[in-house]
Amino acid sequence: SEAAEPDPKTNDDDVKTNEVELDDIGLRFVGLTKDTRSQYNLPKNLKGVVITAVKRDSFASNAGLTVGSVISQISQINVKSADEAKKIFDDAAKKGTESVLLQVYQNDFSRFLILKIK
């Protein structure tokens, strides 16, 4: 059978995404949609969540996270939505984890950084 074209109705980029705020880390982010991609000028094939706010002097700002950066991986888990990212952060916090490894796309480069979460 021929590979079918993905159904345009279920295109990830059209899913309306809720903004998630992680107050204790000082981070706010949303899933990637057509709108957020064009707003932050991000490549089409990039997956993850885009940072919409970073609180001053927070764990997030100390780690070097900036608005418009994309978190594509948390603790080596690929992130596809804001809810999923929140769950990974919540699970890490429940386990008492002090920091997580993030893969972040910033200024056209992908890099890893450590984010303290408590």
Which stretches of residues belong to each language-model region?
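C-terminal recognition in membrane/secretory proteostasis and scaffolding
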Residues: S1-K118
